[in-house]
Amino acid sequence: MAELKITQVRSTIGARWKQRESLRTLGLKKIRQSVVREDNAQTRGLINTVHHLVEVEEVGK
């Protein structure tokens, strides 16, 4: 299964509570922090919630 590299590029100042919690669930706390997550429906849903705060790129295994 493919993996996604998710990088936070914008601050959570002014973001809604649900967006902050989605970033926390993804494991992102600071700007320019990156995590690699499995590409599944749950991860895609979290990314969809915060698409304006993160950059996503596919990582080959």
From Swiss-Prot:
This protein's record includes keyword Ribonucleoprotein: yes
Classification via Pfam families: Ribosomal_L30
Gene Ontology terms: cellular component: cytosolic large ribosomal subunit
Domain of life: Bacteria
Transmembrane feature ranges: none
GO molecular function: structural constituent of ribosome
Keyword vocabulary terms for this entry: Ribonucleoprotein, Ribosomal protein
PROSITE patterns: RIBOSOMAL_L30 (PS00634)
Annotated GO biological process: translation
HAMAP family given in the database record: Ribosomal_uL30_B
Family of the protein in this entry: Belongs to the universal ribosomal protein uL30 family.
Oligomeric and partner information: Part of the 50S ribosomal subunit.
The protein, known as: Large ribosomal subunit protein uL30
Organism: Mycolicibacterium smegmatis (strain ATCC 700084 / mc(2)155)
Encoding gene, per UniProt annotation: rpmD
